[in-house]
A protein has these predicted regions:
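Metallocofactor- and cofactor-centric catalytic cores in central/energy metabolism, strongly enriched
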Residues: 2-328
């Protein structure tokens, strides 16, 4: 059977070998293709930014955040909106066109640093061109299985690092050294001169930076909301109207709680937002009343039963049912 896609970035992948027709997470082949292409153009931009740093040129915070958010967009259960992903591809290419003009020596840059969707007359190529390139640039484009596995292991580690960084960035916490490493390592996955031993070393370095990224996020979270403490959480429901919040973005939760004060609207966490109850700063909100439901993978039935609005802050979403899509 012909592969419509190939994705094996999560532990629940089909047959423990890879989703090839549709993602177990609900991801469709066309979404998988555009995620692959977004990673590819992010690698190209990262090659440019890495070369700029070598030449002594500073890379802007906006560019760092763009690459970080691109990777975060492609992690499991984060974004199934193809139009939004394609928009990020266009934006990434636009930034790269500007930055590559600042590079003094482009001789060592990979093909991904030059690939573009602009035609000779300056217009954008059709979506068919995007999908054709995505097929060329996907996971299986690396033929050697060992090299492929190591490159993807590094990429998935960088995606995890991007998740930590993205959440820390929202709380105005940045580490330029993490950004520089993430981009250098991402660009290195295009370097055919690197051996398996080289990639193993880079994998270990990625792990070290992953720990550093977690520390940055922990410092950002505890600095803003205090140190988590043992807390009893209500798992029942009240009589007031309610809003359900899922994901990991504590800043989004804080903003919602501020906006709902005195309105008679209660706020409930779902799934991975449950730990928010442990932070002292959130205990001052009387309408932050408890947790509704269970794990993220039960959301289709639980969101259907919850009759209020649902706020998804980060990567916990599955393609929604029509019965509650308008409330999401």
């Amino acid at each position: 059977m012909e592969h419509k896609m190939f994705c094996y970035q999560c532990q629940e992948t089909a047959g423990c070998s890879g989703c090839t027709q549709m993602g177990v997470c609900g991801k469709k082949p066309e979404v998988a293709a555009m995620q692959d292409l977004l990673v590819y153009v992010s690698k190209g931009l990262s090659a440019v930014t890495t070369q700029l740093r070598k030449e002594g040129t500073k890379v802007s915070e906006e560019t760092n955040h763009l690459i970080t958010w691109n990777l975060f967009t492609t992690i499991t259960n984060a974004n199934f909106d193809n139009e939004a992903i394609i928009a990020r591809i266009h934006n990434t290419l636009s930034v790269r066109r500007t930055l590559i003009l600042q590079v003094k020596d482009t001789s060592g840059l990979p093909e991904a640093a030059f690939w573009d969707i602009k035609t000779k007359d300056g217009s954008d190529a059709s979506d068919d061109v995007l999908f054709a390139k995505a097929k060329e640039a996907g996971v299986l484009s690396t033929k050697d299985e060992d090299i492929r596995s190591l490159r993807e292991l590094i990429t998935y580690g960088l995606k995890g690092l991007s998740a930590y960084s993205k959440h820390a960035n929202v709380l105005l916490s940045d580490d330029p050294e993490i950004d520089a490493f993430l981009q250098r390592a991402l660009a290195a996955t295009l370097d055919d001169s690197l051996t398996a031993d080289d990639l193993v070393a880079l994998t270990l370095e990625t792990g070290n930076y992953g720990v550093r990224g977690m520390a940055m996020l922990d410092t950002a979270n505890t600095g803003a909301y205090g140190n988590p403490e043992i807390t009893r959480v209500n798992i029942g429901v009240g009589k007031n109207p309610g809003i359900l919040v899922s994901g990991h973005d504590l800043k989004d939760l804080e903003m919602l709680l501020e906006q709902t004060q005195g309105t008679g609207v209660d706020v409930y966490t779902h799934s991975e937002m449950l730990p928010a109850h442990y932070y002292p700063a959130f205990k001052k909100y009387p309408n932050f009343v408890g947790n509704y439901g269970n794990a993220w993978w039960k959301q289709k039935e639980e969101f259907e039963r919850f009759h209020g609005p649902i706020l998804m802050t980060t990567n916990c979403i599955v393609p929604p049912k029509d019965s509650y899509k308008d409330r999401l």
